[in-house]
Amino acid sequence: MKKILFVFALAAVVLTGCNKKSLPPVAEPSWYTNTTYFAEKNGLYSELPVYPKNIVMVGDDYIDRGLWNEFYGDTTVKNRGITYDATDHVLYRIDRIAKQKPGKIFVSAGLNDLLHGTAVDTIVANVKHIFTRVSKLSPETKCYYMNIVLSPVLSEEQKAAGAKVNEAIHEYAKGGAFECIDVNAALQHGIEEGRFSWDGGKLLNGAGYSALAKAIERQIGKPALNLPDDREYPLEVSDYYKHRVSMLRSLPKEKGRIVMLGNSLTNNAPWPELFPLGYIVNRGISGDVVDGVHQRIDMFEGTKPDKFFLMTGTNDFVNDPEVSALKVWERFESLIKDIREQYPTTWLYVQSILPMNPKSPYYAGFNEKAAEVNKLLDAGKERYSYVYLDIASLVSDGNGDLKDECTCDGIHLSATGYFIWSAELAKGLRMMQNLDPTEMLFENN
């Protein structure tokens, strides 16, 4: 898979005329809210190509958590967001994107600067510097800045500072260096009223993302397809979980998709870019458990997915270290039975629970239990008519631990880990649609 992506990247270089422009490097940011998450996402993005006609979304939480290609029904819209990013972090990584000469770049950054206490003048200077570098490295790229949403997550003092940033950047943009889009006007009141967010505006729900996508559709050049969803979900799940489910339920229900189901390991992967075929959708939710996936499989009703690729179970043990492997298998069994009943024509691939590395605080005893569940998953494939994929062995070292090179924090995957996983999925016809009915039989023999 990595070799395939290298070929894509090489092609991008040829298409852009071997851009030789360079600028003095930007210093690495002096602070991170989540160092390992930044390393994970930045490392993965560094391996993914961008093409001349691509639209690239760069920036903070709002960008990272959006499924932009699905909002507009266009796989050329690329997500390069990293949750917790501030203007320093975007500035640090913008050159790599700009050198590949995308058609458009959208930047959302500044909220985390305010939360960190960064001065107004510094934020404004960083935004100007971002677009100055883009204009020098890729003069033909159209640039857009999505201004700071002055939501309740900010103190009154921070809101006042944010208003000054927005005003200064709006005035500067009149010079033509980039267009400033007033997304604050589209989102602020809906967030304050609890329609677009349930946590004060750090996260957006389906209605919030619908409003945001609508606010920038003219600049994107395509109509937004995601519809408002502001239904609240059970309080016993995390804020992130509720907002993510709401966003997923707001997306167009298209038939015949290959659906990636699971927890953060699935959630954090750019599946449409790893397999740029236009019909793979990411339905992972960070923190999800087997029963959580079970409770949301109804969202695919009427869509007749071609395939489900399921990977979950990690958080069952994280949330309850005393739970037995047999109990987790029973949860899997119930989920698999219902998938088979509700989606009888959908191919089901059940992937092993991945091991952890000693760097993880949940490492003690985890790998042994995960291995027990994996044996039961393997043993049940013929009874319940699914393909079992042993991804765990591919990313494990001689001790059965997650390889150091496959992880940043001992539990989540690095770019190397995702490439190994993707290479296994790429074998044969697994990631192709509408296959011969003998496929499942062939896989299990």
Show the residue positions of the predicted features.
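N-terminal secretory targeting modules
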Residues: M1-V58, W68-N69, Q100, E171-K174, ...
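Conserved beta-strand scaffold positions in the cores of enzyme catalytic domains, especially
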Residues: M57, V77-N79, C180, M260, ...
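Oxyanion-hole/transition-state-stabilizing segment in secreted/luminal serine hydrolases
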Residues: V58, I63-T76, T87-V124, I148-P152, ...
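Second-shell loop/turn segments in exported
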Residues: N79-T83, N112-V120, V153-E157, W198-L203, ...
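Charged helix-capping and loop-helix junction motifs
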Residues: V120-I130, K159-N166, A325-E333, F366-N374
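Hydrophobic positions in alpha-helices of CheY-like receiver
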Residues: I130-V134, L335-I339
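A short helix->loop->beta-strand "cap" motif at the edges of active sites that frequently abuts
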Residues: S138-K142, Y343-W347
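Catalytic His-Asp segment of secreted/periplasmic serine-dependent ester chemistry enzymes
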Residues: L150-E232, P355-N445
